[in-house]
Amino acid sequence: MAPPHGEKSTEVKEEPSAVSSVDNRPISTIVFIIAMQTEALPLVNKFQLTEDVDSVFPKGVPWVRFYGNYKGFAINIVCPGKDPALGVDGVGTVSISLVTYASVQALKPDLIINAGTAGGFGAKGASIGDVFLSSEVAFHDRRIPIPVFDIYGVGSRKAFATPNLLKELNLKVGKLSTGDSLDMSPVDEAAIVANDATVKDMEA
Protein backbone atom coordinates (compact mmCIF):
# COMPACT_ATOMS: atom_id res chain seq x y z
CA MET A 1 0.00 0.00 0.00
CA ALA A 2 1.01 3.63 -0.36
CA PRO A 3 2.17 5.50 2.75
CA PRO A 4 -0.71 6.64 4.99
CA HIS A 5 -0.69 10.34 4.01
CA GLY A 6 -4.44 10.22 3.48
CA GLU A 7 -7.23 7.68 3.34
CA LYS A 8 -9.60 6.61 0.62
CA SER A 9 -12.36 5.69 2.98
CA THR A 10 -15.96 6.41 3.77
CA GLU A 11 -18.62 5.42 6.24
CA VAL A 12 -21.92 3.55 6.18
CA LYS A 13 -24.94 5.80 6.18
CA GLU A 14 -26.56 5.27 9.56
CA GLU A 15 -30.23 5.03 8.58
CA PRO A 16 -31.44 1.67 7.19
CA SER A 17 -33.58 3.68 4.76
CA ALA A 18 -30.50 4.61 2.72
CA VAL A 19 -31.16 4.41 -0.99
CA SER A 20 -28.82 3.64 -3.87
CA SER A 21 -28.39 6.66 -6.16
CA VAL A 22 -27.96 4.35 -9.14
CA ASP A 23 -31.40 2.76 -9.32
CA ASN A 24 -33.19 3.95 -6.15
CA ARG A 25 -33.04 0.43 -4.74
CA PRO A 26 -32.97 0.40 -0.92
CA ILE A 27 -29.51 -0.46 0.40
CA SER A 28 -29.46 -3.51 2.65
CA THR A 29 -26.23 -5.38 1.84
CA ILE A 30 -22.92 -3.52 1.92
CA VAL A 31 -19.49 -4.87 0.99
CA PHE A 32 -16.27 -3.14 2.01
CA ILE A 33 -13.28 -4.19 -0.09
CA ILE A 34 -10.07 -3.60 1.88
CA ALA A 35 -6.64 -4.76 0.69
CA MET A 36 -4.88 -5.33 4.02
CA GLN A 37 -6.40 -7.05 7.04
CA THR A 38 -4.67 -4.61 9.40
CA GLU A 39 -6.60 -1.84 7.64
CA ALA A 40 -9.83 -3.80 7.98
CA LEU A 41 -9.61 -4.71 11.68
CA PRO A 42 -10.80 -1.34 13.06
CA LEU A 43 -14.02 -1.68 11.05
CA VAL A 44 -14.33 -5.36 11.93
CA ASN A 45 -14.19 -4.38 15.60
CA LYS A 46 -16.46 -1.35 15.15
CA PHE A 47 -19.19 -3.44 13.53
CA GLN A 48 -18.48 -6.50 15.74
CA LEU A 49 -18.19 -8.76 12.72
CA THR A 50 -17.47 -12.49 12.60
CA GLU A 51 -14.97 -14.18 10.30
CA ASP A 52 -16.61 -16.52 7.80
CA VAL A 53 -15.14 -19.98 8.39
CA ASP A 54 -17.40 -21.61 5.78
CA SER A 55 -16.29 -19.36 2.94
CA VAL A 56 -18.70 -18.27 0.24
CA PHE A 57 -15.71 -18.10 -2.12
CA PRO A 58 -14.15 -20.91 -4.18
CA LYS A 59 -12.21 -23.51 -2.23
CA GLY A 60 -8.51 -22.82 -1.97
CA VAL A 61 -8.49 -19.04 -2.41
CA PRO A 62 -6.98 -17.03 0.47
CA TRP A 63 -9.76 -14.43 0.51
CA VAL A 64 -11.15 -13.51 3.92
CA ARG A 65 -14.67 -12.33 4.72
CA PHE A 66 -16.01 -10.81 7.91
CA TYR A 67 -19.77 -10.41 8.23
CA GLY A 68 -22.55 -9.30 10.54
CA ASN A 69 -25.38 -6.82 10.96
CA TYR A 70 -25.12 -3.19 11.96
CA LYS A 71 -28.11 -0.87 12.37
CA GLY A 72 -30.21 -2.82 9.92
CA PHE A 73 -27.52 -3.35 7.29
CA ALA A 74 -25.88 -6.64 6.32
CA ILE A 75 -22.19 -5.72 6.51
CA ASN A 76 -19.41 -7.64 4.76
CA ILE A 77 -15.72 -6.80 4.81
CA VAL A 78 -13.68 -8.73 2.26
CA CYS A 79 -9.87 -8.84 2.02
CA PRO A 80 -7.67 -10.67 -0.50
CA GLY A 81 -5.95 -12.44 2.41
CA LYS A 82 -2.36 -13.64 2.53
CA ASP A 83 -0.25 -14.90 -0.35
CA PRO A 84 0.02 -18.67 0.29
CA ALA A 85 3.73 -18.79 -0.50
CA LEU A 86 5.00 -15.55 1.01
CA GLY A 87 2.47 -14.79 3.74
CA VAL A 88 2.02 -11.13 2.80
CA ASP A 89 -1.24 -9.35 2.04
CA GLY A 90 -2.45 -9.69 -1.54
CA VAL A 91 -2.14 -6.02 -2.45
CA GLY A 92 -2.42 -4.58 -5.93
CA THR A 93 -4.99 -4.07 -8.65
CA VAL A 94 -5.19 -7.70 -9.81
CA SER A 95 -6.03 -9.35 -6.49
CA ILE A 96 -8.44 -6.59 -5.52
CA SER A 97 -10.24 -6.88 -8.88
CA LEU A 98 -10.64 -10.63 -8.47
CA VAL A 99 -11.96 -10.43 -4.93
CA THR A 100 -14.34 -7.60 -5.86
CA TYR A 101 -15.77 -9.59 -8.77
CA ALA A 102 -16.14 -12.68 -6.58
CA SER A 103 -17.85 -10.62 -3.87
CA VAL A 104 -20.37 -9.25 -6.35
CA GLN A 105 -21.15 -12.76 -7.58
CA ALA A 106 -21.39 -14.36 -4.14
CA LEU A 107 -22.91 -11.61 -1.99
CA LYS A 108 -25.01 -9.55 -4.46
CA PRO A 109 -24.32 -6.27 -2.62
CA ASP A 110 -26.35 -3.12 -3.05
CA LEU A 111 -23.31 -0.99 -2.27
CA ILE A 112 -19.55 -1.61 -2.59
CA ILE A 113 -17.05 0.61 -0.78
CA ASN A 114 -13.36 0.33 -1.66
CA ALA A 115 -11.62 1.64 1.45
CA GLY A 116 -8.11 1.85 2.84
CA THR A 117 -5.02 3.95 3.34
CA ALA A 118 -3.36 5.86 0.55
CA GLY A 119 -0.68 8.41 -0.16
CA GLY A 120 -1.66 12.06 -0.50
CA PHE A 121 0.04 15.08 -2.04
CA GLY A 122 0.41 18.19 0.10
CA ALA A 123 0.64 20.40 -2.98
CA LYS A 124 -2.90 19.29 -3.82
CA GLY A 125 -4.21 20.00 -0.32
CA ALA A 126 -3.83 16.57 1.30
CA SER A 127 -2.63 16.19 4.88
CA ILE A 128 -1.90 13.17 7.08
CA GLY A 129 -5.15 11.82 8.50
CA ASP A 130 -7.42 13.34 5.85
CA VAL A 131 -10.30 11.23 4.58
CA PHE A 132 -11.01 11.53 0.87
CA LEU A 133 -13.82 10.45 -1.39
CA SER A 134 -12.53 9.77 -4.87
CA SER A 135 -14.15 11.83 -7.60
CA GLU A 136 -12.26 10.12 -10.42
CA VAL A 137 -9.75 7.26 -10.75
CA ALA A 138 -7.02 6.56 -13.31
CA PHE A 139 -3.92 4.39 -13.73
CA HIS A 140 -0.42 5.84 -13.70
CA ASP A 141 1.54 2.71 -14.68
CA ARG A 142 -0.34 1.25 -17.65
CA ARG A 143 1.75 2.71 -20.43
CA ILE A 144 0.63 1.75 -23.95
CA PRO A 145 2.20 4.23 -26.40
CA ILE A 146 -0.19 3.51 -29.27
CA PRO A 147 -2.98 5.90 -30.28
CA VAL A 148 -6.25 5.19 -28.44
CA PHE A 149 -4.60 2.35 -26.50
CA ASP A 150 -2.81 5.03 -24.50
CA ILE A 151 -6.17 6.44 -23.39
CA TYR A 152 -7.38 2.93 -22.60
CA GLY A 153 -4.28 2.33 -20.49
CA VAL A 154 -4.86 5.41 -18.35
CA GLY A 155 -8.44 4.22 -17.93
CA SER A 156 -9.80 7.40 -16.36
CA ARG A 157 -13.24 6.84 -14.84
CA LYS A 158 -15.49 9.09 -12.80
CA ALA A 159 -16.66 7.77 -9.44
CA PHE A 160 -20.31 7.73 -8.38
CA ALA A 161 -21.43 11.07 -6.97
CA THR A 162 -22.09 10.94 -3.22
CA PRO A 163 -23.32 14.44 -2.28
CA ASN A 164 -25.06 13.28 0.89
CA LEU A 165 -21.88 11.70 2.27
CA LEU A 166 -19.91 14.82 1.45
CA LYS A 167 -22.43 17.03 3.20
CA GLU A 168 -23.00 14.89 6.28
CA LEU A 169 -19.39 13.81 6.89
CA ASN A 170 -17.61 16.91 5.59
CA LEU A 171 -15.07 14.86 3.62
CA LYS A 172 -12.48 16.05 1.13
CA VAL A 173 -12.76 15.13 -2.54
CA GLY A 174 -9.93 14.43 -4.95
CA LYS A 175 -8.84 12.47 -8.00
CA LEU A 176 -7.16 9.15 -7.29
CA SER A 177 -4.29 7.64 -9.28
CA THR A 178 -3.63 3.93 -8.89
CA GLY A 179 -0.90 1.47 -9.86
CA ASP A 180 0.83 -1.73 -8.79
CA SER A 181 4.05 -0.20 -7.42
CA LEU A 182 4.51 1.29 -3.97
CA ASP A 183 7.36 3.56 -5.02
CA MET A 184 6.99 6.45 -7.43
CA SER A 185 9.36 6.45 -10.38
CA PRO A 186 9.84 9.67 -12.37
CA VAL A 187 7.70 8.34 -15.20
CA ASP A 188 4.95 7.35 -12.75
CA GLU A 189 5.17 10.75 -11.08
CA ALA A 190 4.69 12.46 -14.44
CA ALA A 191 1.61 10.32 -15.09
CA ILE A 192 0.21 11.10 -11.63
CA VAL A 193 0.64 14.81 -12.30
CA ALA A 194 -1.04 14.35 -15.68
CA ASN A 195 -3.90 12.58 -13.89
CA ASP A 196 -4.26 15.67 -11.64
CA ALA A 197 -4.29 13.29 -8.67
CA THR A 198 -4.53 14.30 -5.03
CA VAL A 199 -4.32 10.71 -3.79
CA LYS A 200 -2.20 7.68 -4.84
CA ASP A 201 -2.94 4.06 -4.01
CA MET A 202 -2.52 0.48 -5.27
CA GLU A 203 -6.09 -0.88 -5.47
CA ALA A 204 -8.44 1.62 -7.10
For each feature predicted by the language model, list its residue ranges.
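Metabolite-binding pocket within alpha/beta catalytic cores that recognizes anionic/polar moieties
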Residues: 2-159, 198
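Active-site rim beta-loop-alpha module in soluble metabolic enzymes
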Residues: 147-204
